[in-house]
């Protein structure tokens, strides 16, 4: 029986070898596939090229056929498709809230295997799984340099049994790692440590196999890692378990909306202001079930941390993902976050060989639809009062708050009401800022907005 992780066919004769600093890697060449019948695929959006490579690598004649592969090339004709394909992500990302049931299921499968007289040690994830413990923290202490340690200690006290179980799972199962509490939000850990941009594994009877990093995760903001050119999005627990066991994710070949960025952000304008503007534009267009891919000369002026902020909010603008291609900034970020030199060399060499590397003069891909934004036009903004996708220009903050107080909450008559605070020498009224907290996974990997939030909290 052919493994779900090892291809049986190569209908387009595109399996080649790439040498990087003396290390040989097998890979499925998109350029060779184009030369061997997949005409025009060099014009595909970068995100669809990643999907296409995934199909070429997993062609088995059953879950992935040559017609499925041709359908991606034919997407260029109508710039959309009703073809359903089987996508196998390279890995799975979980957090402790949804990940514990998955580990319980694996343990139950081992019990069942033992009851049937088989070897329970054969039950393991086929795709690599990283479970980041981040959803159990509670803020008991704050406003102190000791707050972090106090909160971590209480977290261990409250969740000792769960954490002991996960620690057992990390030791018992192959292909399963647990990132301990207090390390960071799972999407931050994924972006800064786990993601590789190009993944490798040992191939059966050959050199190591190189392919684009991709994943599904059990949290909607898994999309953050698309800022690092890693295709991924959030799925339900059952789908994640299926992917963990080597089963494909069924999906339609998506429409891809191209979002052209030009210019650069003005001083004092942050990635938060930008992402609120992008979200407003994309929600107006309607991108549910679609990929969004960012392109244009503005990418040359957009740090990877800002790209990750934009990619993170894909659930808020409704897209499956917001993808950024590999370029010079991607390589610089991998270096800055301490990835291995050999991996960084592979990422650049592989991306260039596959036509997955963006440069300033790279021709624009073909998209289903496009829209554009001059980064210089973005203005300072806030969100709310209820939903993160509701952008309010900072200049309109007072006016927007007064409107919301009256229309949303029916308290317009109390706008000027002040209430003395017992045992304090101040009073409070509607509109006063009483809590300043840095909590969102959207911001935790962006030092610029972290500093801005800290200054706001301080003042």
List PLM regions with ranges.
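Fe-S-dependent hydro-lyases/dehydratases of central metabolism
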Residues: 1-459
